[in-house]
């Protein structure tokens, strides 16, 4: 691809340290992969393993598809049958993978910022492996964030001045935290809605909380979030949760769908709870980008993986 500044990174664990021009370059690279069908040409083998300590369908399969399209050799890893169950630390597991010849790890883990121990090494530590964060607890989800940015850019062609509403279980959503960070930096106006008990004043620096029906007619993007029941341990509001009531107050139904602007898009990181965040028969509607997001995820993850290959000079890429 001509006239493109290709990104090179030693790891890809968060969007916080990405420069705006790197974000835009990754979007362009992913769009190039999608339109051209081209892939990076590796001149030497690269070995990757996907270490998912939390359940995943989309992200796990999407990363593996991206890896295979790039020509990487994927080495299976099953946490349920690993030595982690014998008490082995994530660092030691990574050290084992590294010693066996693994070049890259794609990791999803319930611990926030689990990657700090793997990338900020002490003087005596010898771990030398690229880490791609596929989601850390309620912290960050950089690949979902980047595919969201790609999907928005693909539809609108820009970010500046777009009005984006992030709706739902915001406090427990790693997607929301990554997306609000990048959207505001790229010039979008961010708004929040959903149950106030799942909203934190910490988010006020990124946008404004409003009632959903006030936002509906004004927004360009409606970004819906799954209710994260698995992260509500000890939360008294979980016991009071009622799916029908949530859908009535915070979900996108036909009435709200019809009240949106003509060009408004609906996004959701998945999995969608039908008739909770979104009416089930709207999942494949014209405005809903759910399927498009999944399609774009493969190409964006190719761009992210390629950036780490370049950063680590793997596969003959520099």
From Swiss-Prot:
L-aspartate binds at residues 86, 174, 226. GO terms for cellular component: cytosol. This is Aspartate carbamoyltransferase catalytic subunit. Transmembrane segments: none annotated. NCBIfam families: asp_carb_tr, PRK00856.1. SUPFAM superfamilies: Aspartate/ornithine carbamoyltransferase. It is an enzyme of class 2 (transferase). Catalyzes the condensation of carbamoyl phosphate and aspartate to form carbamoyl aspartate and inorganic phosphate, the committed step in the de novo pyrimidine nucleotide biosynthesis pathway. GO terms for biological process: 'de novo' pyrimidine nucleobase biosynthetic process; 'de novo' UMP biosynthetic process; amino acid metabolic process. Heterododecamer (2C3:3R2) of six catalytic PyrB chains organized as two trimers (C3), and six regulatory PyrI chains organized as three dimers (R2). Keywords: Pyrimidine biosynthesis, Transferase.
